[in-house]
A protein has these predicted regions:
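PP2C/PPM-type serine/threonine phosphatase catalytic domain
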Residues: 1-306
Length: 306
């Protein structure tokens, strides 16, 4: 499907926000061909350096409400304390407090927050952040987030490999989300990294990552300098692959090199450059392996389908 055809189909492109300099980010979302509603949500504020993608689940407008709740809490935090981990936890509490949500109203989320020459990523579920860096061929595309999903737990435990995970029948089952459970606590994974000149971040729902191969994503990001065009072509690629789910993307370019060279600030409330939460993931892998060995895998299959 062509970029122009994508723009003709009912979907929303987020206007790139700028404060005088050329905008360096753009987002787009599309319901796909198989879903009546678009339960994804996205928001960005380039001036404040915040971007979010949320993928709602639950059906019958429940997912739409959940993803909107996530976005609203990120907006609130961007305008006040900039504590995005707390914002996701507030959204979790709000959804648990909704009488309709205890059973199945939930959302994934991936958030990017910029602090000087660094960016920080917060995520829950299987919405992803990728880092594209220039290089030979179509550059290098690296997945920065680790899915909170059943198949990722199997990969971490060594039960299956990533290739098997891509076609696993339970690849859409997630093990952590905002809302969607009766657990009052929510663990938010975080990582941080310095921007490098020429870098480009991609946030997306699984409507893109489950349909389009990383090589194709890297080619689109490398061949299209304009963020809006890149976002539209990513949507088009997912639609060409079948458009079986809602599709949402945000493309974010690194700040101007002059800004990078003049800033080394990291906020006091932001995590260290190393990804946090390794211990928790190791424990999860051990627990998963034990569950598989003990015949409790069926319990995991009862987790939220995505």
């Amino acid at each position: 499907m062509s970029e122009a055809k994508v723009r003709d189909v009912s979907r929303h492109t987020v206007p790139r926000q700028s404060t005088g300099n050329q905008a360096r980010s753009a987002g787009a979302t599309h319901p796909g061909f198989k879903r009546e509603q678009n339960e994804d949500a996205l928001w960005s504020d380039e001036q404040r350096g915040v971007w979010v993608v949320a993928d709602g689940l639950g059906g019958h407008q429940a997912g739409e409400i959940a993803s909107k709740t996530v976005v609203e809490e990120i907006q609130r935090s961007a305008a006040t304390d900039r504590h995005y981990e707390h914002a996701l936890q507030r959204a979790h509490a709000l959804l648990l407090g909704d009488e309709q949500s205890a059973a199945n109203m939930g959302s994934t989320a991936v958030v990017v927050a910029e602090e000087g020459a660094y960016f920080h990523i917060y995520w829950v579920g299987d919405s992803r952040a990728y880092l594209w860096s220039p290089g030979e061929g179509h550059g290098r595309l690296k997945q920065l987030t680790n899915d909170h999903s059943y198949v990722q737990m199997l990969v971490d435990s060594g039960a299956i490999n990533p290739q098997e995970a891509a076609s696993h029948p339970n690849r859409h089952v997630i093990t952590r989300c905002i809302g969607g459970s009766t657990n009052p606590s929510l663990d938010v994974d975080r990582m941080s990294s310095p921007w490098q000149a020429g870098d480009r971040l991609l946030l997306c729902s699984d409507g893109l990552s489950a349909e389009v191969e990383p090589q194709a994503i890297a080619e689109i990001l490398s061949c299209n300098d304009d963020c809006r065009r890149a976002a539209d072509l990513l949507i088009a690629a997912a639609l060409d692959a079948g458009g079986k789910d809602n599709i949402t993307v945000q493309v974010i370019d690194a700040p101007d090199p002059a800004r990078l060279s003049g800033s080394d600030y990291m906020g006091a409330d932001t995590p260290s450059p190393a990804r946090l939460g390794n211990t928790a993931r190791i424990v999860l892998a051990v627990v998963t392996a034990a569950a598989l060995a003990s015949g409790f895998a069926g319990w995991l299959l009862g987790l939220i389908p995505h």
